[in-house]
A protein has these predicted regions:
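Nucleotide-activated sugar donor-binding and catalytic core shared by glycosyltransferases
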Residues: 1-207
């Protein structure tokens, strides 16, 4: 798959440089609290309709960070209201409460921009949104560079890196609720599978 990566491709250059910077975020570390965490990045309503169903029936030994594509207040409120787990917004906590209280929550909604890439460094599993829309999935290289296995929707054929990673089995493409549930359950309950797919992702970015 070396032909996928064009020499001088700024997308690859940028994500590789991400590893050289400080990606720590104290409030994410407090929220994660050494718990297995799924980071959902750039999600759209179609993604969220499936993800919310999974979140609401999930056990408390997994946490979720959601960074929606649309962070308008109405959209964020609607998202939060559908989630039955203990949920907090970035705007509710980071500047107004003690960070230590974050570990009490199951879901953290990031209603701000500019920090998603750093958040991916804390992910055990990533879901990258946009794959149910047109033109398709958002940037999967950001979580991949941290060695995180990625789950996406079905529309990815216009993106060479997504196509390559699906073919290499570092990334799982899903089309419906059942497939999403199966993908997350596989990655949550099979550590070897999770680590292997993550290794495929990180190796691909650095090729």
């Amino acid at each position: 798959f070396n032909n996928v990566k064009v020499s001088g491709d700024t997308r690859f250059d940028r994500v590789v440089s991400i590893l050289e910077r400080d990606n720590s975020l104290d409030f994410i570390e407090q929220f994660k609290d050494n718990t297995t965490t799924i980071v959902i990045g750039s999600s759209w309503p179609k993604d969220e309709s499936l993800l919310i169903n999974y979140i609401n029936q999930s056990s408390d030994d997994v946490k979720f960070i959601i960074a929606p594509h649309n962070i308008k207040q109405e959209q964020i409120s609607n998202l939060k209201n559908q989630i039955q787990k203990k949920t907090i917004l970035f705007s509710e906590n980071v500047e107004t409460r003690l960070i230590a209280s974050l570990q009490e929550y199951n879901v953290f909604i990031i209603d701000t921009i500019g920090i998603l890439t750093k958040i991916y460094s804390y992910a055990d599993i990533a879901y990258v949104g946009g794959g149910f829309g047109n033109p398709g999935v958002h940037n999967i290289l950001e979580p991949a560079t941290f060695g995180v296995p990625v789950v996406i929707g079905p529309n990815y054929s216009h993106f060479a890196e997504a196509t390559a990673l699906v073919n290499m089995e570092g990334c799982i493409s899903i089309q419906n609720q059942t497939q999403l549930n199966e993908a997350f359950d596989l990655l949550l309950h099979n550590e070897d599978e999770r680590l292997e797919k993550g290794h495929i992702c990180s190796t691909f970015v650095q090729m």
